[in-house]
Amino acid sequence: MATLTRQDLNFGQVVADILCEFLEVAIHLILYVRDIYPSGIFQKRQKYNVPVQMSCHPQLNQYIQDTLHCVKPLIEKNEAEKVVVVIMNKEHHPVERFVFEISQPPLLAISSETLLSHVEQLLRAMILKISVCDAVLDSNPPGCTFTVLVHTREAATRNMEKVQVIKDFPWIVADEQEVHMEEAKLIPLKTMTSDILKMQLYVEEKTQKSS
């Protein structure tokens, strides 16, 4: 059975394509499950052979797509450590942080037949876990909003500045209150391990959400 290495195929690009497609679905599902937007703006779709809820709101969808478009070059170069969906209350204080911790093996040689099928199974399991995360999380206060943060390796700063010049969607340094949350508990949701990608998903939830 033939094997593929990084020299034969741009695995960074493959991983970035797979991961950004997954993150788009995951972000939509988080917003639906956690009641950040009215359920009426979501439609049921099929992804990874499971039903998911996807937004039909053009501006919201564009924001998510633009964000992931800027994240993608960082994933390709293995410079993104975490992608975080931050849920904030009316005072813009975080009440939940969905953290996708990403790592890629530096070297690999895998069979082409198993490149995608195994990863899709793992991503399906992660989507299913997100869809039922309400069971382990407390309700959020009304009027919550969200933002997406990216934690990068130090060497990625210059690359982010280049992307900022190209895209009309500038990177800004996150506010300290968005990055750190006091009195939070950590709730592990799912871990996946494959030949091309390792990812851990957990939630940091504020103990007292009511202000």
Swiss-Prot record:
PROSITE patterns: HORMA
Domain of life where this protein originates: Eukaryota
Residues annotated as domain HORMA: 13-203
Keywords: Cell cycle, Cell division, Cytoplasm, Cytoskeleton, DNA damage, Mitosis, Nucleus, Transcription, Transcription regulation
UniProt function note: Adapter protein able to interact with different proteins and involved in different biological processes. Mediates the interaction between the error-prone DNA polymerase zeta catalytic subunit rev3l and the inserter polymerase rev1, thereby mediating the second polymerase switching in translesion DNA synthesis. Translesion DNA synthesis releases the replication blockade of replicative polymerases, stalled in presence of DNA lesions. May also play a role in signal transduction in response to DNA damage.
PANTHER family: MITOTIC SPINDLE ASSEMBLY CHECKPOINT PROTEIN MAD2 (PTHR11842), MITOTIC SPINDLE ASSEMBLY CHECKPOINT PROTEIN MAD2B (PTHR11842:SF10)
Protein name: Mitotic spindle assembly checkpoint protein MAD2B
